[in-house]
Curated annotation (Swiss-Prot):
Organism: Thiobacillus denitrificans (strain ATCC 25259 / T1)
Encoding gene per record: hemH
Family indicated by similarity: Belongs to the ferrochelatase family.
Amino acids binding Fe cation: H210, E291
Protein name, UniProt field: Ferrochelatase
Record's subcellular location: Cytoplasm
GO cellular-component term (any): cytoplasm
């Protein structure tokens, strides 16, 4: 194996901890040309599609990549903003705000950056950049509160694959999940309360999570259970009775059975039942994206109203909500434990590095 190029080791180099915020990814533009490589990378991941590779290669390259890019591009065009893809815009803002929060609350400097599992900026690219900036300890913090092999695990795969090709490796920590973390639940509840204070409350709250194939649950993936726990804790925090909320799953792809009940079918049923107002929130999406802004806010609204519903509200994701940024910061700090020197000061750090360098040079080191 050929390892990545390394600069010559220099004694006394400033070192620090880092946090890498990882989200799923987005195409570079809302066009079929940009969607094709993005979808190819995403759908070629065996963590995402678990069927025999040879068969899937034929389906992907012979059918899907010749039809789906145009359809997906139309959906992305409906939500694209002047700043770009909403997912990328929100994730970048979250990283900047998290950096500011940690700058105020962490005992020592922390580098914060973000990466996408698919598309750019990629995980290997950003990890290399953080290492070059002096990070010798990096926490990989997924934007997915609920663990799933098809989201969380594949992000870790990419990080570990980069680590495997790196000669002078930084220490790497991963955060598996925070679906039941009190700070996360409080942020979700605060976000909903803020929305309801301005727009009133619904007859039914639909908590929609991204779906995964049913067989993943049967094979041991805890995702379904973690979604249910998040929903239960959020309902309790809001004081909701069982009849006041539903837990559903969206974004089904292909013909296989996915986790149920499906969000679209539930919205249609609520409309037929004559429910006056439905609010939809997506607790598993910490940043608004195609699945929330187009699939829920547009398609979901149309389905509910067409079935006889009267009023539909999509409650925005956590995005840059102040309580979410604080929650993200506290979650990060807890997982940086032992990596941040409580007694750190710039002067003490400089003195320690200079002493280390002078000792190394005295022993014959060149740098």
């Amino acid at each position: 194996m050929k390892y990545a190029e390394e600069p010559e080791y220099a004694h006394g180099t400033p070192l620090c901890a880092g946090v890498l915020l990882v989200n799923l990814g987005t195409p570079e533009a809302p066009t079929a040309a940009a969607l094709r490589p993005y979808l190819k990378e995403f759908l070629s991941d065996p963590r995402v599609v678990e069927i025999p590779r040879a068969l899937w290669w034929l389906v992907l390259n012979g059918i899907i990549l010749n039809t789906r890019p145009r359809k997906s591009a139309e959906k992305y065009a409906a939500i694209w903003t002047s700043e770009g893809s909403p997912l990328k815009v929100h994730t970048e803002k979250q990283a900047k705000l998290l950096k500011g929060w940690l700058g105020e609350h962490a005992a020592a400097p922390v580098v914060v950056d973000y990466a996408m599992r698919y598309g750019r900026p990629g995980i290997p690219e950003v990890l290399a950049r953080m290492k070059a900036a002096g990070c010798d300890r990096i926490l990989v913090l997924p934007a997915y509160p609920q663990y799933a092999a098809s989201s969380t695990a594949t992000a870790f795969d990419a990080a570990f694959d980069w680590l495997r090709r790196t000669r002078n490796q930084p220490a790497l920590r991963t955060l598996k999940h925070y679906h039941d973390h009190p700070e996360y639940i409080r942020a979700l509840a605060a976000n909903l309360r803020d929305y309801w204070q301005m727009h009133g409350r619904p007859d039914v709250l639909v908590m929609s999570f991204h779906g995964v194939p049913r067989y993943t649950l049967d094979k041991g993936d805890p995702y379904h259970c973690e979604c249910q726990k998040t929903a239960r804790l959020l309902a309790a925090a809001l004081g909701l009775e069982p009849g006041q909320f539903r837990v559903t799953f969206q974004s089904r792809f292909g013909r296989a059975e996915w986790l149920k009940p499906y969000t679209d079918k539930t919205l249609e049923a609520l409309g037929r039942e004559g429910v006056g107002r439905v609010d939809v929130v997506a607790p598993g999406f910490t940043a608004d994206c195609l699945e929330t802004l187009e699939e829920l806010a547009m398609e979901g609204r149309a389905s509910f109203l067409a079935a006889g519903g009267k009023e539909f509200h999509y409650v925005p994701a956590l995005n840059e909500h102040p309580q979410w940024i604080a929650a993200l910061g506290r979650i990060a700090l807890a997982n940086l434990a032992g990596w941040l020197d409580e007694g750190w000061t710039p002067d003490a750090d400089e003195a320690s590095r200079q002493l280390s360098r002078s000792r190394a040079l005295a022993l014959g080191a060149q740098r």
